Every structure is written in structure tokens, then in C-alpha cells.
């Protein structure tokens, strides 16, 4: 649905985007991450036809954004970071006005407005003045605007910015519901929201893609699949002999015995490269140990993101085979 090849955009001597290439397939919800100044908003504005590019190709639902701009833009619903609403208009009349601007036929405007109101749970405020709405509801109006012409693709720039935790949960739930009907590309600084909402992540730094994949794939490729020690609680005949044997297992750097309760022994295991839990489980089965706990905290997406943008992890681009 979205194809970007060799995209470049400069502001004077500063490269905002450099030779950027990526794609988003039909039905995907893709998170677009990067530090401030990475080029996220510039890329999104180019995808929506708001900015020209210096070089490269952009295809939206099969249409070239530069030579077939109107056809391409008619397939896009765009929610900018700062939603430009008319505060003196009522919600319903604003959406009807926007539907007409987007080419919705007059006899279908009321139907499309009603659909957008229901999708965004705005039916009970459709006659309310926009300027009297809370930040969360204004964000919903912006999203309803993006949806009113039934686009194939939604491009959402910081859809939860400035919202309180309750409002963030509402918008997250709404985006998940929309994912069944639309291809979605969204950017956010709230990395936990991206992880809970998106099926795949693109990490942008200094105008270039430095990593792409599912959150789990990015953890693996960054070498940060686990954060901290693995805890193993087992019933073994000889706790000290087990302690000596554990470092011989794959992906175990070291082990320490941290507690004993009756016949149960608790070990803290420091991983080397990779995840030692499969090997630990297989060893417990092979030796007939009773297993009560085998746990570890996975690295957060924030830790993985920081690793990539600070150069702690090598650039990663997963193959189509690994994403299928």
C-alpha cells in the first residue's frame, strides 16, 4: 500500500531524509519511531503530498504521490501532530464540510459523517462546539476527519500526544479497531504505546532507517532480548553441583545460588549473547528436575530503540521472508 524508494529531502545544507526506502503492506499497523529531528514528520508530510521531495519515489495504493497527487491523496487519511480544527464549528458540521472538501458525493456526506462519528465514538457530541471539547475529544475529531472519506491508508503523526493516560487508552483501542479496515502508519514518542498497537516498527535516525521488524525481532537483533538476570527455581538433589553445571549450558555467562527453601533452590543466571531459557528448560527435563520458576524480564522497546539510535546495535533490515 505504501512504497518509498530512495527518498531524499534537504532544508538548505541539512538533510532531513537521506535515501530512505521502506514499504508498508495492506493491513499492517506500522510504528514509525525516531528521536526529534530524525525525519519522521518530514517523511509523513511527503507521503501525504504536503511537501515535495528532492529525489526518490513514493507510491500510495499504486499511485505516484508526485505525478498522480490527487488520486494518491484521496487514498490517505492524515492526522497531523497538531490537528487544525475550526473551534467555532460544531463537530458534525465540521466533518460534513471536510467530507465535501475530500470529494465525498453530496448524497453520501451524511452517511459518511455518521460512520466516522460512530467509529470514533463521537455521536453524543456531534452538535457540540469543537472549541469546548477536551484535548482527547478534539483528537478524536481529527481522527474522524481522517476517516470520513473511507481512505485505504491512515497516516497518524503522534496520535496520543498531550493526552492523559485514560485518553491514551481510548485512542489506542480506537486505532486497534481501525486496523481491521485500514493500513496504518503512525509515529509516536510513547514507545510502550507503539509496542501495544503496532505489528511492525521502523526506527529512523538522522534521516535513515536503522532497523525494521517486529518488537521481538528488534530485541533479538539488538542483542537486548533479555534485560537483566534469569531466575531459575528448581528442586534438585545437589544444589552445589547444579550451580557448577549451569554455566556449561548455551547462553549462560554465569550463575549464582541466591536462595534455598526446603528442597527448592533458586539460581540467578546472567545471560551471554542469546536467551538461555530454552537450554535451561531442556536441562531440567533431561535431569528430571521439578521446575517452579523460569523467568526473565524482556528488554523494553525503549531500551531497544536507544540501542539503535545511539549506535549500540548494528543497522538491521529484516528480509521479507523473516516478516512473513
Predicted regions and their residues:
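C-terminal coupling/interaction segments
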Residues: 272-324
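A generic structural signal for secondary-structure junctions
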Residues: 77, 103, 142, 220-224, ...
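Positions that flank functional sites
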Residues: 114, 132, 261-262, 299
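ABC transporter nucleotide-binding domain
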Residues: 172-272
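ABC transporter nucleotide-binding domains
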Residues: 2-4, 9-206, 210-211
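A short linear hydrophobic-aromatic micro-motif
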Residues: 121, 252-258, 290-295
